[in-house]
Amino acid sequence: MSSMDNTMQFNFNDDSFDADVQEVLLSVYDALEEKGYNPINQIVGYLLSGDPAYIPRHKDARTLIRKLERDELIETLVKSYLRSHGKENK
């Protein structure tokens, strides 16, 4: 069995980092809303494509979101969703 067939384990646990991600996402959300965009659609577009053009420069939203890796943003979103449904692994 090659190493490509094995499941890799990824561990990342830093609650202070999660708070930073939440702060950035909320700031970006507010900036998108102020500019008249659908914040969810724009953030999802950015997360899927990596194209910062989905995020406006308004209120430095583009600079803020680009300080974080997309995989870190996605991980925090998944953890938050699962936590809100009582499913997060402690």
Curated annotation (Swiss-Prot):
The lineage of its organism: Bacteria, Bacillati, Bacillota, Bacilli, Bacillales. Belongs to the UPF0297 family. This is UPF0297 protein ABC1593. It comes from the Bacteria.
